[in-house]
């Protein structure tokens, strides 16, 4: 028996294997709210253009709201024979209000533009949700930054001690990464803010519709200017997947350092028991599973981006069934990102900063060497390359004595070019605050950085 809504031109029924293989209902039912939202906007537009009667519009809206209620309450019966959420909702609507009125809803609309509209609405909503979560994470980082302007720790290059910085300066580096993530999402949201609804299959419609009205009802800034582009565009999905991938690049780096810094080799931070797990065999273990899982989930969001890029790379215009595969990766990446940002924020709120361990770690690796070289250039007018060589010799002498250069009692005994003033440089806090360039580790600079981020957050 033929029961598909599109089966009029077919002489036989679809094979059961095809029905199951072709269906996307188990995935795209996530879009039920967006589909109902889009249908109400479309019906409202049709009524304003005289294509639907007022009583027909009222019946359609009432019926769609009943469908929404049934789905939300778990009373809606999803049947894979309905193929997708769009057909499932339309079928149920016709059961509620009758096919004579329900069948008019799809006038001047194709599933091609319907799907694209629903998907865009979901993507737009996801942008806004992710921006909110990133904002909250930045706010947590700012609290740590304000509290730890004088908490000195080593910075690293090549995972070796580089120069002393504050924990405030360190965590602000990640806050600025997240600020860029928000800006990236804002840019993508702006590009996605064009409605494809009314593009129909690919060439528009012969009905005198008002696409601008349905776009306005749905909260879009404008309409897609070309109907063929409207139904075949998935740039908005690619943009979101890329934005999420970059977010995970940043959070994965942070999580990697949280794992390292919480290890017994560093002990810079302590992760709360609330966000740690134990071992099935080793009673002493306290594992940073939150950080490890976020680091691991980075691979799946990268994979979702590559998957959609590959799906779209050679598709002829306009719509192709391949594009049915565009949603699962988005749904997965969005959920993964939201879950990860929420738990990362909760974990960071409770981390303990071990100030003494951080300071003690600064006494390894000769981190004040650059300060000495800069002093020779600035105060003794020595070319930097020569100063670099002189201080390198100081480091060699310190290592020969088994000490850090911060522990040297008299630099002039190693090289007479150093005077008493040079000894003042062998102080981590002095080193921290001696930096004068914009964006540096000094307390004054850190305070400016905090102000920049707070201003950005307030204007969101």
Swiss-Prot record:
Enzyme class of the recorded protein, top EC level: lyase
Protein name (database record): Argininosuccinate lyase
EC numbers on record: 4.3.2.1
Catalytic activity: 2-(N(omega)-L-arginino)succinate = fumarate + L-arginine
Annotated gene: argH
Entry GO terms, CC: cytosol
Keyword Lyase attached: yes
InterPro entries for this protein: Arg_succ_lyase_C, Argininosuccinate_lyase, Fumarase/histidase_N, Fumarate_lyase_CS, Fumarate_lyase_fam, Fumarate_lyase_N, L-Aspartase-like
Lineage: Bacteria, Pseudomonadati, Campylobacterota, Epsilonproteobacteria, Campylobacterales
């Amino acid at each position: 028996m033929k029961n598909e809504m599109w089966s009029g031109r077919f002489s036989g029924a679809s094979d059961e294997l095809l029905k199951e293989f072709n269906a996307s209902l188990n995935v795209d039912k996530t879009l039920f709210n967006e589909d109902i939202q889009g249908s109400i906007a479309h019906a409202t537009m049709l009524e304003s253009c005289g294509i639907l009667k007022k009583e027909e519009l009222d019946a359609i809206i009432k019926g769609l709201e009943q469908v929404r209620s049934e789905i939300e309450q778990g009373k809606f019966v999803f049947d894979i024979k309905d193929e997708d959420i769009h057909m499932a909702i339309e079928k149920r609507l016709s059961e509620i209000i009758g096919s004579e009125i329900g069948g008019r809803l799809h006038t001047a609309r194709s599933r091609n533009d319907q799907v694209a509209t629903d998907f865009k609405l979901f993507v737009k909503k996801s942008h806004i949700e992710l921006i909110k979560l990133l904002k909250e994470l930045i706010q947590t980082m700012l609290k740590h930054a304000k509290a730890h302007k004088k908490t000195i720790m080593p910075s690293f290059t090549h995972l070796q001690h580089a120069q002393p910085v504050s924990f405030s300066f360190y965590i602000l580096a990640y806050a600025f990464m997240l600020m860029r993530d928000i800006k990236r999402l804002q840019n993508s949201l702006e590009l996605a803010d064009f409605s494809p609804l009314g593009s129909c299959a690919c060439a528009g419609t012969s009905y005198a519709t008002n696409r601008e009205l349905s776009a306005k009802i749905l909260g879009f800034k404008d309409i897609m200017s070309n109907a063929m582009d409207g139904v075949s565009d998935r740039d908005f999905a690619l943009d979101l997947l890329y934005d999420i991938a970059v977010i995970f690049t940043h959070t994965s780096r942070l999580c990697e350092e949280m794992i390292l810094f919480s290890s017994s080799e560093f002990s810079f931070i302590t992760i709360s028991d609330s966000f740690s797990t134990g071992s099935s065999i080793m009673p002493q273990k306290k594992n940073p599973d939150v950080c490890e899982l976020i680091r691991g989930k980075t691979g799946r969001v990268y994979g979702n981006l590559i998957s959609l890029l590959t799906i779209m790379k050679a598709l002829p215009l306009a719509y192709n069934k391949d594009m049915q595969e565009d949603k699962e990766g988005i749904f997965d990446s969005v959920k993964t990102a939201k879950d990860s940002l929420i738990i990362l924020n909760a974990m960071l709120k409770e981390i303990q900063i071990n100030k003494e361990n951080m300071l003690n770690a600064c006494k390894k690796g000769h981190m004040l060497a650059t300060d000495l070289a800069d002093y020779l250039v600035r105060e003794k007018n020595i070319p930097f390359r020569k100063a670099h060589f002189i201080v390198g010799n100081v480091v060699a002498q310190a290592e020969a004595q088994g000490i850090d250069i911060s522990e040297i009692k008299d630099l002039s005994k190693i090289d007479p070019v150093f005077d008493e003033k040079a000894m003042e440089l062998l102080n981590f806090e002095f080193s921290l605050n001696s930096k004068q360039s914009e964006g540096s580790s000094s307390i004054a600079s850190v305070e400016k950085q905090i102000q920049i981020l707070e201003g950005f957050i307030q204007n969101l």
